[in-house]
Amino acid sequence: MSVLALAASGRGLVDPAEAVIRADDEALLRGRAAFETLRVYGGRPFRLEAHLDRLTASAESIGLPPVERLRVQVLAGLVLPKANRGDASLRLVWTAGPPEGPPSGLALLSEVPEWIEPARERGATAVSLLGVRAAVPWLLPGVKSTSYAVNMAAEAEAKSRGADEAVFVDGDGIVLEGTVTNVWWRHGDTLRTPSLDLGILAGVTRATLIELAPACGYTVEEGAFALRDLLEAEEAFTSSSVREVMPLVEIDGRALGRGPASEQLQKALRELAAASS
Protein backbone atom coordinates (compact mmCIF):
# COMPACT_ATOMS: atom_id res chain seq x y z
CA MET A 1 0.00 0.00 0.00
CA SER A 2 1.61 3.21 -1.19
CA VAL A 3 1.27 6.43 0.82
CA LEU A 4 0.08 9.27 -1.39
CA ALA A 5 0.13 12.21 1.03
CA LEU A 6 0.56 13.14 4.69
CA ALA A 7 -0.53 16.24 6.60
CA ALA A 8 0.26 16.99 10.25
CA SER A 9 -0.87 19.58 12.79
CA GLY A 10 1.22 22.74 12.65
CA ARG A 11 3.10 21.60 9.56
CA GLY A 12 0.59 21.09 6.79
CA LEU A 13 1.61 18.80 3.97
CA VAL A 14 4.86 16.97 4.65
CA ASP A 15 6.90 14.31 2.91
CA PRO A 16 5.37 10.96 3.95
CA ALA A 17 8.89 9.74 4.72
CA GLU A 18 9.39 12.47 7.35
CA ALA A 19 8.84 11.93 11.07
CA VAL A 20 5.79 13.83 12.34
CA ILE A 21 5.22 12.34 15.81
CA ARG A 22 7.35 13.49 18.76
CA ALA A 23 9.23 10.76 20.57
CA ASP A 24 7.38 11.63 23.80
CA ASP A 25 3.90 11.69 22.23
CA GLU A 26 1.72 9.40 24.34
CA ALA A 27 0.38 7.88 21.13
CA LEU A 28 3.82 6.33 20.71
CA LEU A 29 4.61 5.67 24.36
CA ARG A 30 1.20 4.45 25.58
CA GLY A 31 -1.01 4.00 22.54
CA ARG A 32 -3.15 6.99 23.53
CA ALA A 33 -4.56 7.95 20.17
CA ALA A 34 -7.80 7.49 18.27
CA PHE A 35 -8.11 6.97 14.54
CA GLU A 36 -10.54 6.50 11.69
CA THR A 37 -10.02 4.92 8.28
CA LEU A 38 -12.42 5.65 5.45
CA ARG A 39 -12.76 5.20 1.74
CA VAL A 40 -12.33 7.99 -0.74
CA TYR A 41 -14.40 7.63 -3.92
CA GLY A 42 -13.75 9.92 -6.87
CA GLY A 43 -11.56 12.09 -4.67
CA ARG A 44 -14.29 12.61 -2.02
CA PRO A 45 -14.34 11.00 1.44
CA PHE A 46 -17.39 8.82 2.05
CA ARG A 47 -19.42 9.68 5.16
CA LEU A 48 -16.69 11.88 6.62
CA GLU A 49 -19.00 13.40 9.23
CA ALA A 50 -19.94 9.98 10.62
CA HIS A 51 -16.26 9.09 10.91
CA LEU A 52 -15.50 12.39 12.64
CA ASP A 53 -18.34 11.69 15.07
CA ARG A 54 -16.82 8.32 15.92
CA LEU A 55 -13.32 9.79 16.18
CA THR A 56 -14.67 12.33 18.67
CA ALA A 57 -16.41 9.61 20.70
CA SER A 58 -13.32 7.37 20.71
CA ALA A 59 -11.09 10.23 21.86
CA GLU A 60 -13.50 11.01 24.69
CA SER A 61 -13.57 7.36 25.80
CA ILE A 62 -9.77 7.19 25.87
CA GLY A 63 -9.54 10.47 27.78
CA LEU A 64 -7.81 12.42 25.02
CA PRO A 65 -8.14 16.17 24.62
CA PRO A 66 -11.30 16.95 22.63
CA VAL A 67 -10.97 16.43 18.89
CA GLU A 68 -10.73 19.71 17.02
CA ARG A 69 -12.94 18.73 14.10
CA LEU A 70 -12.13 21.75 11.98
CA ARG A 71 -8.40 21.10 12.32
CA VAL A 72 -8.86 17.46 11.30
CA GLN A 73 -11.04 18.47 8.36
CA VAL A 74 -8.41 20.95 7.20
CA LEU A 75 -5.75 18.23 7.34
CA ALA A 76 -7.99 15.91 5.34
CA GLY A 77 -8.56 18.67 2.81
CA LEU A 78 -4.82 19.05 2.32
CA VAL A 79 -4.22 15.42 1.36
CA LEU A 80 -7.39 14.64 -0.63
CA PRO A 81 -6.27 16.41 -3.85
CA LYS A 82 -3.47 13.84 -4.06
CA ALA A 83 -6.12 11.21 -4.82
CA ASN A 84 -6.48 12.90 -8.23
CA ARG A 85 -10.25 12.40 -8.15
CA GLY A 86 -9.73 8.66 -7.80
CA ASP A 87 -10.29 6.10 -5.05
CA ALA A 88 -8.06 5.97 -1.99
CA SER A 89 -7.94 5.23 1.72
CA LEU A 90 -7.90 8.10 4.22
CA ARG A 91 -6.73 7.65 7.80
CA LEU A 92 -7.36 10.36 10.40
CA VAL A 93 -5.46 10.22 13.70
CA TRP A 94 -5.85 12.26 16.90
CA THR A 95 -3.07 11.78 19.44
CA ALA A 96 -2.71 12.78 23.08
CA GLY A 97 0.52 14.58 22.27
CA PRO A 98 3.43 14.92 24.73
CA PRO A 99 2.66 15.06 28.48
CA GLU A 100 2.43 18.86 28.45
CA GLY A 101 0.38 18.90 25.22
CA PRO A 102 -0.86 19.90 22.78
CA PRO A 103 -2.68 17.05 21.02
CA SER A 104 -1.77 16.31 17.43
CA GLY A 105 -3.76 15.52 14.32
CA LEU A 106 -2.67 13.58 11.25
CA ALA A 107 -4.24 12.80 7.88
CA LEU A 108 -2.72 10.02 5.80
CA LEU A 109 -3.88 9.27 2.26
CA SER A 110 -2.95 5.89 0.78
CA GLU A 111 -3.76 3.73 -2.19
CA VAL A 112 -6.48 1.14 -1.68
CA PRO A 113 -4.70 -2.18 -1.00
CA GLU A 114 -4.39 -4.22 -4.19
CA TRP A 115 -5.33 -7.49 -2.50
CA ILE A 116 -8.91 -6.43 -1.72
CA GLU A 117 -10.56 -6.99 -5.11
CA PRO A 118 -8.96 -10.43 -5.71
CA ALA A 119 -10.02 -11.41 -2.18
CA ARG A 120 -13.58 -10.26 -2.86
CA GLU A 121 -13.62 -12.32 -6.04
CA ARG A 122 -12.51 -15.56 -4.37
CA GLY A 123 -14.08 -14.93 -0.96
CA ALA A 124 -12.31 -14.75 2.40
CA THR A 125 -11.81 -17.47 5.00
CA ALA A 126 -11.97 -17.06 8.78
CA VAL A 127 -11.43 -18.83 12.08
CA SER A 128 -13.26 -18.11 15.32
CA LEU A 129 -11.25 -16.87 18.31
CA LEU A 130 -12.25 -16.03 21.87
CA GLY A 131 -12.91 -12.33 22.46
CA VAL A 132 -13.77 -10.79 25.81
CA ARG A 133 -14.38 -7.09 25.14
CA ALA A 134 -18.09 -7.10 26.03
CA ALA A 135 -17.39 -8.74 29.41
CA VAL A 136 -14.68 -6.26 30.38
CA PRO A 137 -15.78 -2.71 29.47
CA TRP A 138 -12.51 -1.20 30.69
CA LEU A 139 -10.98 -2.68 27.52
CA LEU A 140 -12.81 0.11 25.65
CA PRO A 141 -15.24 -1.89 23.52
CA GLY A 142 -16.38 -0.05 20.41
CA VAL A 143 -13.43 2.37 20.52
CA LYS A 144 -11.03 2.83 17.61
CA SER A 145 -7.71 3.43 19.33
CA THR A 146 -4.23 2.84 17.97
CA SER A 147 -3.78 0.15 20.66
CA TYR A 148 -4.46 -2.51 18.03
CA ALA A 149 -1.98 -5.13 19.19
CA VAL A 150 -4.70 -7.62 20.21
CA ASN A 151 -6.48 -7.28 16.88
CA MET A 152 -3.25 -7.71 14.94
CA ALA A 153 -2.28 -10.71 17.07
CA ALA A 154 -5.66 -12.27 16.30
CA GLU A 155 -5.17 -11.64 12.59
CA ALA A 156 -1.71 -13.20 12.76
CA GLU A 157 -3.17 -16.23 14.56
CA ALA A 158 -5.80 -16.59 11.85
CA LYS A 159 -3.17 -16.45 9.14
CA SER A 160 -1.05 -19.04 10.98
CA ARG A 161 -4.07 -21.34 10.71
CA GLY A 162 -4.35 -20.70 6.99
CA ALA A 163 -7.26 -18.24 7.19
CA ASP A 164 -7.59 -14.62 6.08
CA GLU A 165 -9.54 -13.26 9.03
CA ALA A 166 -10.50 -13.92 12.65
CA VAL A 167 -14.04 -13.70 14.00
CA PHE A 168 -14.26 -13.04 17.73
CA VAL A 169 -16.79 -14.98 19.82
CA ASP A 170 -17.38 -14.57 23.54
CA GLY A 171 -17.18 -17.22 26.23
CA ASP A 172 -20.79 -18.25 25.55
CA GLY A 173 -20.13 -18.75 21.85
CA ILE A 174 -21.83 -15.50 20.79
CA VAL A 175 -20.46 -13.93 17.61
CA LEU A 176 -18.93 -10.48 18.13
CA GLU A 177 -16.91 -9.02 15.24
CA GLY A 178 -13.87 -9.47 13.03
CA THR A 179 -10.45 -8.03 13.80
CA VAL A 180 -11.18 -4.92 11.72
CA THR A 181 -14.66 -5.71 10.41
CA ASN A 182 -18.29 -6.24 11.32
CA VAL A 183 -19.77 -9.66 10.61
CA TRP A 184 -22.99 -10.49 8.74
CA TRP A 185 -24.82 -13.61 7.58
CA ARG A 186 -28.06 -14.50 5.82
CA HIS A 187 -30.93 -16.89 6.45
CA GLY A 188 -33.48 -16.54 3.65
CA ASP A 189 -34.33 -12.86 3.31
CA THR A 190 -33.03 -12.00 6.78
CA LEU A 191 -29.58 -10.59 7.46
CA ARG A 192 -28.17 -11.01 10.94
CA THR A 193 -25.39 -8.98 12.51
CA PRO A 194 -24.23 -8.74 16.14
CA SER A 195 -25.80 -5.99 18.21
CA LEU A 196 -23.82 -2.96 19.31
CA ASP A 197 -24.88 -3.87 22.87
CA LEU A 198 -22.26 -6.62 22.70
CA GLY A 199 -19.49 -4.03 22.81
CA ILE A 200 -18.55 -4.25 19.15
CA LEU A 201 -17.45 -1.39 16.94
CA ALA A 202 -20.26 0.72 15.52
CA GLY A 203 -19.04 0.43 11.95
CA VAL A 204 -19.94 3.26 9.60
CA THR A 205 -20.25 0.77 6.74
CA ARG A 206 -22.34 -1.46 9.01
CA ALA A 207 -24.77 1.42 9.55
CA THR A 208 -24.81 2.13 5.82
CA LEU A 209 -25.67 -1.48 4.97
CA ILE A 210 -28.52 -1.42 7.50
CA GLU A 211 -29.89 1.56 5.54
CA LEU A 212 -29.41 -0.15 2.17
CA ALA A 213 -30.69 -3.63 3.04
CA PRO A 214 -34.47 -3.00 2.75
CA ALA A 215 -34.18 -1.69 -0.82
CA CYS A 216 -32.22 -4.85 -1.66
CA GLY A 217 -35.05 -7.01 -0.31
CA TYR A 218 -33.65 -7.90 3.11
CA THR A 219 -34.63 -7.32 6.71
CA VAL A 220 -31.90 -6.88 9.31
CA GLU A 221 -31.85 -8.50 12.74
CA GLU A 222 -29.37 -7.20 15.30
CA GLY A 223 -28.85 -9.37 18.36
CA ALA A 224 -26.77 -11.93 20.23
CA PHE A 225 -26.35 -14.89 17.89
CA ALA A 226 -24.46 -18.12 18.48
CA LEU A 227 -21.56 -19.17 16.29
CA ARG A 228 -23.57 -22.19 15.14
CA ASP A 229 -26.14 -19.81 13.63
CA LEU A 230 -23.38 -18.24 11.55
CA LEU A 231 -22.01 -21.64 10.53
CA GLU A 232 -25.46 -22.73 9.33
CA ALA A 233 -26.04 -19.56 7.28
CA GLU A 234 -26.74 -19.55 3.56
CA GLU A 235 -24.03 -16.94 3.10
CA ALA A 236 -21.84 -14.69 5.22
CA PHE A 237 -19.74 -11.60 4.75
CA THR A 238 -17.90 -8.86 6.58
CA SER A 239 -18.10 -5.10 6.22
CA SER A 240 -15.61 -2.28 6.71
CA SER A 241 -14.88 1.08 5.16
CA VAL A 242 -11.87 0.03 3.13
CA ARG A 243 -12.75 -3.62 2.41
CA GLU A 244 -16.42 -2.73 1.87
CA VAL A 245 -18.52 -5.94 1.60
CA MET A 246 -16.27 -9.02 1.70
CA PRO A 247 -17.83 -12.48 1.22
CA LEU A 248 -16.87 -15.19 3.72
CA VAL A 249 -16.66 -18.62 2.10
CA GLU A 250 -15.26 -20.63 5.01
CA ILE A 251 -15.28 -20.41 8.81
CA ASP A 252 -13.43 -22.89 11.03
CA GLY A 253 -12.94 -25.14 8.02
CA ARG A 254 -16.66 -25.24 7.24
CA ALA A 255 -17.58 -24.10 3.74
CA LEU A 256 -20.22 -21.40 3.30
CA GLY A 257 -22.09 -20.76 0.10
CA ARG A 258 -21.77 -17.68 -2.04
CA GLY A 259 -25.05 -15.81 -2.17
CA PRO A 260 -26.73 -12.75 -3.63
CA ALA A 261 -26.81 -10.49 -0.58
CA SER A 262 -23.12 -9.63 -0.49
CA GLU A 263 -23.09 -8.81 -4.20
CA GLN A 264 -26.28 -6.74 -3.99
CA LEU A 265 -25.10 -4.78 -0.98
CA GLN A 266 -21.66 -4.19 -2.48
CA LYS A 267 -23.30 -2.85 -5.64
CA ALA A 268 -25.68 -0.66 -3.62
CA LEU A 269 -22.81 0.66 -1.51
CA ARG A 270 -20.80 1.63 -4.58
CA GLU A 271 -23.84 3.30 -6.15
CA LEU A 272 -24.45 5.31 -2.99
CA ALA A 273 -20.79 6.33 -2.87
CA ALA A 274 -20.88 7.39 -6.51
CA ALA A 275 -24.00 9.47 -5.91
CA SER A 276 -22.31 11.12 -2.92
CA SER A 277 -19.11 12.03 -4.77
Placement of each model-derived feature along the sequence:
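Ordered, amphipathic secondary-structure segments that act as subunit-interaction surfaces
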Residues: 85-94
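Phosphate/pyrophosphate-binding loops at sites that engage ATP/ADP/AMP, CoA/4′-phosphopantetheine
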Residues: 79-84
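Helix-start/capping segments and mature chain N-termini
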Residues: 1-67, 73-78, 95, 99-277
